[in-house]
Amino acid sequence: MKVKVGINGYGTIGKRVAYAVSKQDDMELIGVTKTKPDFEAYLARERGIPVYAASEEFLPRFEKAGFEVAGTLSDLLENVDVIVDATPGGMGAKNKALYEKAGVKAIFQGGEKAEVAQVSFVAQANYEKALGKDYVRVVSCNTTGLTRTLSALQEYIDYVYAVMIRRAADPNDSKRGPVNAITPSVTVPSHHGPDVQTVIPINIETMAFVVPTTLMHVHSVMIELKKPITREDVIDIFENTTRVLLFEKERGFESTAQLIEFARDLHREWNNLYEIAVWKESISVKGNRLFYIQAVHQESDVVPENVDAIRAMFEMADKWESIRKTNKSLGILK
């Protein structure tokens, strides 16, 4: 029997999760919500996805445009087993009462505080902790990226120091910035380090900057080691870590631009690069310190985590069975 899934919020993350759910043989996409009849709503309808108004207050917008919706969020909740909340940060916590009243399990995104859910989730790091849970939070794109590589190295970690170089806005966002500035997060740690600690128990400090680009985030990671490891060991670990790929500058991957072009060349939906990209040349061990640089596609790296979270919550598969199914369905390279 397939798990019935609804998506509350059909934007950058919501539409990608909807696509991913539609590719699973053990899930059924029941519908998505929108606050207005914009081009995304029309495209969803053309793709055969039932569109619901996010609440009754938004119905006049659809009526004015002659856009017939399948109902409201309340109607959607009556027909699903789980709702993926992909609304803007902070809205998920407000929506939780609706999900509780409807008796529906819910997945929240990283824009929500950890307290909104019973567990913060990255599949390869703590899948088992989400088994049977009613409320799970998939952590943010940056936290997911850090957790993927750090969890693979966890036994070697004494202390992590990481700098987040964050994109200013998503490609479709014409309202955010900066356009001609670099904006530091002046408090230390930035929120990313404490967020990683909601998934894996490590010592970590983070700093962050926002720069004028839309393509990806970049992380500069330095780890103080508690036991020896060689560069070759790290390369071997990353080569055998799911959803992490090594890229080489000498093969043309000089920047995030080429990484996104790689995703385009793979004919990925929306240029999705689900995998965390680590520059192989950046991996360096100096004494008891390990260094590497990685890039995170902020629009898509959390998408497979949402799919795996559904399976964990309904105990549909064990960790590696779920990861394998999700990876295969989305064309994730390893």
UniProtKB/Swiss-Prot annotation:
Pfam families per record: DapB_N, Gp_dh_C
Family from the record: Belongs to the glyceraldehyde-3-phosphate dehydrogenase family.
Gene that encodes it: gap
Protein name per its UniProtKB record: Glyceraldehyde-3-phosphate dehydrogenase
Species this protein is from: Thermococcus kodakarensis (strain ATCC BAA-918 / JCM 12380 / KOD1)
Pathway annotation from the record: Carbohydrate degradation; glycolysis; pyruvate from D-glyceraldehyde 3-phosphate: step 1/5
Binding-site positions, NAD(+): T12, I13, G111, R167, Q298
Enzyme class: oxidoreductase
Catalytic activity annotation: D-glyceraldehyde 3-phosphate + phosphate + NADP(+) = (2R)-3-phospho-glyceroyl phosphate + NADPH + H(+); D-glyceraldehyde 3-phosphate + phosphate + NAD(+) = (2R)-3-phospho-glyceroyl phosphate + NADH + H(+)
Main location: cytoplasm
